[in-house]
Regions:
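A short beta-loop-alpha structural element at the N-terminal edge
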Residues: 1-14
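A short helix-loop-beta-strand connector motif used in the catalytic cores of GNAT acetyltransferases and
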Residues: 37-49, 70
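Conserved beta-strand in the GNAT
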Residues: 49, 55-63, 70-75
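Conserved active-site alpha-helix within GNAT-family acetyltransferase domains
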Residues: 87-88, 111-130
Length: 150
């Protein structure tokens, strides 16, 4: 397995991987080729990919605003889970954030994502129960489509 920084050229394999993750939400604008390229241009060193030869087996979009980092779309291809791929990518993202003097990183996990929530707890992340999460949609055209569950 090789962990490396995500590049815009990885998009086709990234999209194919995301489409295999059941229950995953893909946004029509943010997760388009242009949306991912825009994110990577703003955060050129912090998003990671995991490879087994030419096969993309994991990916994390990771960025920051100068104060706090955030992980988006953390995923590992089925069949490669529970082999350290996710943890290796998370560690690489956190190291990249530290180099940019970011001191804290957050993520959002759906409450129904039992596998993901178990993973974050296992690797030492803290679930916050002292705050509420709010969002506001600025572009109604940025539609989220969820990958069908089996």
């Amino acid at each position: 397995m090789e962990i490396r920084v995500m590049k815009a050229e990885d998009y086709d394999k990234l999209y194919e991987l995301l489409m295999t993750i059941k229950g995953f939400g893909i946004r029509s604008i943010d997760d388009s080729r242009e949306g991912v390229a825009r994110f990577l241009k703003r955060n050129p060193t912090t998003s990671m990919t995991a490879w087994d030869g030419d096969t993309l087996i994991g990916a994390i979009l990771c960025g920051h605003d100068g104060r706090r980092g955030c992980l988006y779309h953390v995923c590992v291809r089925k069949g490669y889970r529970r082999h350290g791929v996710g943890k290796a990518m998370v560690v690489a993202c956190m190291e990249a954030l530290r180099k940019e003097e970011i001191n804290k990183v957050t993520l959002i996990a759906f409450t129904k994502n039992d596998i993901g929530n178990a993973f974050w707890n296992k690797i030492g992340w803290t679930e916050r129960e002292d705050l509420n999460y709010y969002d506001f949609t600025l572009n109604e055209a940025n539609i989220t489509a969820f990958i069908e569950e089996d």
